[in-house]
Amino acid sequence: MYRSPLLPLPRRPTARQLAAWGTGLLLAAGLAAAVVHAWRISRHFPTAPFPQPSRLYARIPELTLGEPCALAELASRLTSLGYEREPAAPAAPAAPAAAAAPAAPAASGRRAPGDGSPRTGTFNLTAEALSVGLRRFPTPAGWAGGQPLAVEVRAGRVARLRLGGQPVARAALEPPLLASFYGPAGEERWPVRLEDLPARVVRGVLAAEDDGFFHHSGLSASAIARAAWIDLRGREIRQGGSTITQQLVKNLYLPRRRNLLRKTKEALLAEIVELRHDKRAILEAYLNSIYWGRSGPANLIGMGAAARAWFGKPPEELDLAQAATLAAMIRAPIDASTPARRAALLGRRNRLLGRLADLGWAGRDEVRRAQAEPLGAAARPLAPRPCAPRFADLAAQEARRRFGIADLAGGGYLLFSTLDAGEQWRAEAALAAD
């Protein structure tokens, strides 16, 4: 009769094997815990509202038909708000008499206000008329502006008003900002929406930081390799190894210290955020969280704050050269107060403009014109003009008393006062002259 051979008894695991298995289980448990933690963190990631300072505005200026108006003073008010005067259009050469077309009847030889409206944030001025592309601005009833306004003045009084091409009897202007109330972090923020930004602004940031943003899943092996190669060759880093998603999770959720554990968490969070959220939402959150230096007592956080501080205008009004300058500052957000620093920033800007052309995101002729422009950025970020600080303190106290606001700092409230900023500045100037 056949007898099967005896099977050997199983060996007991050695201490080394037990240690290896235990280490593997711990690593697996740690990885699972890290994934769950990262998943929970990323849930509210791009949609979490950023804290904003509360702002106090002066009285909203108004123009009314028949009321006194000095165009020079109106132009000065617009300039103080960051509006730029457009250069006068050169006169067209006179046509030969034989070829001249019949002239259309007109009350005067000048262009009527409202024809050829200026761009948003700019104005045209003549002896009897002013046209301005109003920005959007807050009012107690909601947001206003965003349309061209044309003003005609005769004998020192408003004779005609046209808002958005339509005749009106009254028109509001943008109110001056009197004060901002910052939270404990001291952050100046003007959040932007991606859909409101021109392509040149967004492309400048992408070209500087992550030109493959829309083609990777959070990590970019090619960007890491390129950054390492440039480092090895001892050249300036034109594009870092971290993707925009990595930079964002690092800025929002991770400590500043650099070590392997933090880099691992950064990579894991970046991948999970890319899985859970839309690319455009991630990019918008990034543009609202970049550090761009300091303005007075506040840190400049986000594209909206940076454009206002460095160029005195919202990002929607930046030209190609200005947009490239801001993008070139992301890696080194220092002031440009010395010739050496301005020269270094100018070089970075022009190299970035060249990269935009290489990527096909800007035309060669357009890039050459932008490279020929001066730097344009302020030597240091523009701090808001101080106006009536005692009045601002009293207004804050009144807001807390009347509306039960516990803390204005970082609350994002908009307060509107009755103070006339123009009269206040004239009074301060008169006192200073005595």
Question: Model regions: which residues?
Answer:
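Juxtamembrane regions of bacterial inner-membrane/periplasmic proteins
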Residues: 2-434
